[in-house]
């Protein structure tokens, strides 16, 4: 099973640049085209939050226009830049989304790997949290299929990155989440967005990775006094490849037209 993860496209209204520097809409369209060019194509696309930038209806209308060109099934979760009500309205045809409250869900109909989405967003705030109710829901949901390889998807990552301005807006309650995940050995990966960079660490007895953005990259600055900044690095996405004999292998794919391929000499 091949699962693409696109994150943080920050779609804007037509003609408006993201952060005044990037045409995030055009970049997202290119990312979708890159998915279609893969051979084999992914079986599923995960969209791991911050699908629009300001949470407005015009942005969601533009997002749905762009997603009409996506020929692969997709699963979505909100990020801190999304508005929960507007998000739910925009994706009212996605019947796996709950009608009210946090957008937790589990879907296992697209292939061998089950996707369990944990909504850690807090309306009106940029940091996230795993509360007791969310942890209990996750524990019970994972217990339902203990033998099924599973990806847990959430937006804000539950660890300190070392980038000071990112860590202000991390997901709180990481120890609570780790305690739950460590009880369920079928969790092959926790996948997040939010930080606009690829990061990887061990967490709760499994691997956790964050996806890059399809638009700007948040600057990698590890000094305590560093100020928030973005770079126009090549956008990218992740490709998670499940094979029973191997497990889940995650690939990082920059988006763009690059020279090659060149045969090995």
Predicted regions, residues:
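Short glycine-enriched, charge-decorated loop/helix-capping segments at active-site entrances
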Residues: 17-23, 93, 124, 163-170, ...
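Extended active-site neighborhood of metal-dependent phosphoesterases/phosphodiesterases
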Residues: 57-144, 149, 176-186, 223-242
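Active-site-proximal beta-strand elements of phosphoester/diester hydrolases
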Residues: 1-13, 112-122, 151-153, 206-212, ...
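Active-site environment of divalent metal-dependent phosphoester hydrolases
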Residues: 11-14, 53-58, 80-88, 123-126, ...
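Active-site neighborhood of phospho(di)ester-bond hydrolases with catalytic His/Asp-centered motifs
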Residues: 5-7, 43-50, 74-80, 119, ...
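His/Asp/Glu-enriched short active-site or ligand-binding loop at hydrolase and phosphoryl-transfer sites
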Residues: 211-222
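N-terminal active-site segment of His-dependent metallophosphoesterases
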Residues: 1-62, 102
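His/acidic metal-ligating clusters that form di-metal
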Residues: 30-44, 127-207, 231, 236-239, ...
């Amino acid at each position: 099973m091949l699962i693409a993860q696109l994150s943080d496209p920050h779609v804007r209204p037509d003609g408006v640049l993201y952060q005044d520097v990037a045409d995030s809409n055009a970049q997202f369209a290119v990312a979708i085209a890159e998915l279609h060019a893969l051979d084999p194509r992914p079986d599923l696309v995960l969209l791991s939050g911050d699908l629009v930038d300001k949470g407005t209806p015009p942005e969601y209308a533009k997002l749905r226009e762009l997603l009409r060109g996506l020929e692969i099934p997709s699963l979505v979760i909100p990020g801190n830049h999304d508005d929960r009500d507007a998000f739910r309205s925009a994706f009212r045809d996605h019947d796996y989304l709950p009608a009210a409250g946090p957008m937790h869900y589990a879907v296992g109909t697209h292939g061998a790997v089950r996707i369990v989405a944990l909504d850690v967003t807090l309306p009106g705030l940029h940091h996230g949290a795993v509360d007791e109710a969310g942890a209990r829901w996750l524990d019970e949901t994972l217990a339902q299929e203990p033998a099924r390889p599973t990806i847990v998807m959430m937006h804000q990552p539950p660890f300190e990155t070392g980038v000071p301005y990112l860590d202000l807006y991390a997901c709180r309650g990481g120890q609570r989440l780790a305690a739950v995940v460590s009880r369920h050995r079928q969790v092959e990966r926790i996948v997040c967005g939010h930080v606009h960079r690829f990061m990887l660490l061990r967490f709760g007895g499994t691997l956790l990775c964050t996806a890059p953005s399809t638009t700007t990259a948040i600057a990698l600055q590890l000094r305590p006094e560093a100020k928030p900044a973005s770079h126009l690095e090549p956008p990218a996405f992740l490709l998670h490849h499940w094979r029973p004999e191997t497990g889940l292998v995650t690939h990082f794919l920059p988006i763009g037209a690059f020279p090659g391929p060149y045969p090995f000499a």
